[in-house]
Design a protein with these regions (language model features):
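Alpha4 helix (beta4-alpha4-beta5 surface) of REC/receiver domains from two-component response regulators
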Residues: 65, 85-106, 111-114
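Acidic, metal-coordinating helix/loop segments flanking the phosphotransfer/catalytic sites
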Residues: 32-50
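The C-terminal output helix
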Residues: 119-137
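Acidic catalytic/metal-coordinating carboxylates
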Residues: 35, 59-65
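Basic, Lys/Arg-enriched C-terminal extension of HTH/homeodomain DNA-binding domains
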Residues: 182-219
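Active-site residues of response regulator receiver
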Residues: 54-56
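Two-component/phosphorelay signaling modules centered on CheY-like receiver
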Residues: 12-31
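Helix-turn-helix DNA-binding segment
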Residues: 134-181
C-alpha cells in the first residue's frame, strides 16, 4: 500500500480531515480538496492513483461531472464516490452514464472506515464488485421511484406549482396531480387531502436522497 497517492474531494471540512487522517494511517499519501476547481489543480499536480469523491460539491460541477473530467486525462485512475445520495438519478445523471470500474458508497451505509479502505484498494486493483456499488443495491433508499416520480419530486422541492410542473413536463395539471399522488405513495407519505402532504413529501425526499446534507456521521 505504501506509495499510493489519493486525492479526497469533500466539501465537509470535518469529514475531509477524518478521511485524510484515516488514509494516512493506512499508509497512503493524501491530498485534499473542498471543491472541483482545487481538485482539478491538485489532480494535475499530483497524478493520484485514486480519488475519493463526494457527489454534492456545492455550486458548479458535481462529483460525477468532475470524475469524467479527471478520467479524460488519466483513465486508469480509481474512483470511489462517497456520498449521501442513494443513486445518480437524484442529480439528473443517468446511472448508465457513470464511469465503469468505480465504487459507489453511501455514507450512511458505512459502519466504519474499513469498508472505505477495502473499496479504495479493490478499485485501485480494478476488481470492483456489485457489493461496492451501493447505487445498485435494490434496498437503497427510494429505489422504487420511477424517473418521472423523481422528476416530479425534484420540481416540487424547487417550489414549483402543479401548473408550473405541468408546463415544464408538457402535461396536464391532472396528470401532474396523479404523478404526485403516486410519488407520495412510493415514498410512504399519506396523500390525504391535507395541506401538509406536499411539504412532508418534499422534506422526506430531500432528507432521504441526501440533497439536504446531515452532519458527518462516518466513524
Amino acid at each position: 500500500m505504501d506509495g499510493r497517492y489519493v486525492l479526497i474531494v469533500e466539501d465537509d471540512a470535518l469529514l475531509r480531515e477524518l478521511l485524510a487522517t484515516a488514509l494516512e494511517s493506512w499508509g497512503y499519501t493524501v491530498q485534499t480538496a473542498s471543491n472541483a476547481a482545487d481538485a482539478k489543480r491538485l489532480f494535475k499536480m499530483s497524478d493520484p492513483d485514486g480519488v475519493i469523491l463526494d457527489v454534492d460539491l456545492g455550486p458548479g460541477l458535481n462529483g460525477f461531472d468532475l470524475a469524467h473530467i479527471l478520467l479524460e486525462s488519466a483513465p486508469a485512475t480509481a474512483i470511489v464516490f462517497l456520498t449521501n445520495i442513494p443513486d445518480s438519478r437524484f442529480v439528473e445523471v443517468d446511472p448508465d452514464g457513470l464511469p465503469t470500474g468505480i465504487a459507489y458508497l453511501r455514507k450512511s451505509a458505512l459502519s466504519d472506515l474499513n469498508l472505505l479502505a477495502s473499496a479504495l484498494d479493490v478499485t485501485m486493483r480494478g476488481e470492483v464488485t456489485n457489493e461496492l456499488r451501493h447505487d445498485r443495491d435494490k434496498n437503497r433508499p427510494f429505489a422504487n421511484l420511477t424517473k418521472k416520480q423523481i422528476e416530479v419530486l425534484r420540481l416540487m422541492s424547487q417550489g414549483k406549482s402543479n401548473a408550473q410542473i405541468a408546463n415544464i413536463r408538457g402535461t396536464s395539471i391532472k396528470a401532474v396531480e396523479d404523478a404526485i399522488r403516486r410519488a407520495c405513495e412510493a415514498i410512504g407519505v399519506d396523500n390525504s387531502v391535507d395541506g401538509n402532504t406536499r411539504t412532508s413529501a418534499v422534506a422526506k425526499y430531500l432528507s432521504v436522497t441526501g440533497l439536504i446534507k446531515p452532519s458527518a456521521t462516518v466513524k
